[in-house]
């Protein structure tokens, strides 16, 4: 089953030329399990994205995307993970998230946050549901100054609640992994 993902998919950093394909993937799930993303937002954040590229045919095809966003000195967020329905269930999303987790470890981030409906998927990577806000009051006050929606979602601020209903806030503690 994962043979498909291993042999025909390359995980790599996104490039400017991938942004429209990332938008296509995000639009597949927008309004249901992902928040909509404007094209300009994707261009502004392309450096945070990684893609899964199908390499067994020409032209090569972007079949999944995901981003790692740094929220604080000890906290990152996995965001905007989308897998093309044609390859769902074949391990592509797992390979992509594994790559984002490895990148977070390389950056020295001890914790990773995700806001998701896909709790079983992320639980397989060690993410656990959280309640409250696992940061000190001083860090909370500093993070409140951010205009980033992901920070507001992590802090569970009231103004983002209408956009996050039904989602689960989950945390992976990389510093506790063996």
Indicate where each model-derived feature is located:
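Conserved active-site alpha-helix within GNAT-family acetyltransferase domains
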Residues: 106, 110, 116-144
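Conserved acetyl-CoA-binding loop-helix of GNAT-fold acetyltransferases
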Residues: 83, 89-102, 113-114
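A generic "binding-loop/recognition-motif" signal
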Residues: 18, 74, 117-118
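Short amphipathic alpha-helix that is part of the acyltransferase structural core
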Residues: 1-36, 53-54, 61, 165-178
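C-terminal "cap" of GNAT-fold acetyltransferases
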Residues: 135-178
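Glycine-biased flexible loop/turn sites that connect beta-strands or occur in inter-domain linkers
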Residues: 60-61, 122
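Short, hinge-like loop/turn segments at secondary-structure boundaries
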Residues: 29-30, 130-132, 148
């Amino acid at each position: 089953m994962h043979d498909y993902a291993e042999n025909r998919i390359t995980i790599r950093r996104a490039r400017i030329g991938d942004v429209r394909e990332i938008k296509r993937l995000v639009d597949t799930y927008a309004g249901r399990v992902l928040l909509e993303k404007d094209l300009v937002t994707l261009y502004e954040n392309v450096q945070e994205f990684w893609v899964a590229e199908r390499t067994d045919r020409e032209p090569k095809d972007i079949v999944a995307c995901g981003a790692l966003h740094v929220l604080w000195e000890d906290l990152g967020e996995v965001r905007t993970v989308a897998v093309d329905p044609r390859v769902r269930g074949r391990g592509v999303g797992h390979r992509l998230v594994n790559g984002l987790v490895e990148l977070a470890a390389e950056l020295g981030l001890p914790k990773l946050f995700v806001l998701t409906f896909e709790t079983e998927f992320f639980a397989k990577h060690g993410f656990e549901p959280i309640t409250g806000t696992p940061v000190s009051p001083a860090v909370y006050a500093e993070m409140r100054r951010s205009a980033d929606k992901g920070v507001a979602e992590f802090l569970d601020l009231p103004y983002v609640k209408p956009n996050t209903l039904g989602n689960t806030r989950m945390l992976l503690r990389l510093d506790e992994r063996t």
